[in-house]
């Protein structure tokens, strides 16, 4: 039985490696937006400091180590409407307590409708504006003098992203460790893709009312495989945060001071994407 499982794993690894080598693979920075914009108003306002937050079923999305600090009856639903209704997103988060180790599940959806497709509206007939004459500028893919755009050829398509985030956490000595597996189904017009990734988190309480958190998103380099054979890969992002709660003796209010530091390994420029393949 062990030999059988070992053989199956070797075969699957070989097929996966072969499919990767036979397709175009890109290092990119965009593609998992539904995970970056998800959250409720409270936790999104914390920015990177959200890695120190805990107590709700949305918190593990920012730091998986908070998965064991969610109330058993905690259920979150969030709806976002952005860019005058063009972008709509939903999030549902809840704790699963039926296992020996706590699990937290978050389901996400983001959709954009009525995206104009203008790829085929150029009447690329050249300077004379007459098709088939072979004059200068004909079929060069540029809008030249004498050419025009046909608005009747504008088509519209939609984009849909559906994702899940399943996390757990465990304590060892003075640290809490967290691990999350996430998946994404991305539909863009007539194209579709599926991706997987892993997040890792740490949470510590080094002093009274103080918290330090660390999250490594896409620690295994996440993948997004399109039905065309193109593979998009995403580099890890490191986010660290620190927070302290001040209890005001003369007032029932509390004051939270927070700070964060982010290191995005994908870089900052728009033209530094790398490509390898055949």
Residue spans for each PLM region:
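Bacterial Sec-dependent N-terminal signal peptides
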Residues: 1-25
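Subset of outer-membrane beta-barrel
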Residues: 24-278
């Amino acid at each position: 039985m062990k030999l059988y499982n070992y053989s199956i794993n070797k075969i699957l690894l070989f097929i996966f490696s072969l499919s990767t080598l036979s397709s175009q693979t890109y290092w990119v920075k965009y593609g998992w937006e539904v995970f970056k914009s998800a959250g409720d108003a409270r936790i999104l306002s914390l920015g990177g400091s959200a890695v120190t937050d805990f107590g709700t079923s949305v918190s593990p999305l920012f730091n998986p180590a908070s998965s064991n600090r969610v109330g058993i009856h905690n259920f979150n639903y969030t709806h976002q409407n952005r860019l005058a209704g063009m972008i709509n997103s939903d999030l549902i988060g809840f704790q699963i307590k039926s296992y020996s180790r706590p699990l937290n599940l978050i389901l996400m959806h983001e959709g954009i409708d009525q995206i104009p497709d203008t790829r085929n509206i150029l009447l690329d007939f050249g300077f004379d504006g007459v098709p088939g004459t072979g004059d200068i500028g004909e079929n060069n893919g540029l809008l030249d003098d004498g050419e025009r755009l046909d608005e009747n050829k504008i088509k519209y398509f939609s984009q849909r992203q559906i994702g899940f985030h399943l996390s757990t956490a465990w304590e060892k000595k003075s640290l809490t460790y967290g691990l999350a597996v996430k998946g994404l189904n991305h539909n863009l017009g007539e194209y579709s893709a599926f991706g997987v990734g892993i997040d890792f988190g740490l949470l510590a309480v080094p002093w009274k009312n103080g918290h330090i958190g660390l999250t490594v998103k896409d620690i295994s380099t996440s993948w997004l495989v399109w039905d065309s054979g193109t593979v998009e890969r995403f580099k890890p992002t490191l986010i660290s945060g620190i927070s302290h709660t001040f209890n005001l003796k003369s007032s029932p209010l509390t004051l939270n001071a927070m700070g964060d530091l982010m290191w995005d390994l994908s870089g900052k420029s728009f033209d530094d994407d790398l490509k390898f393949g055949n």
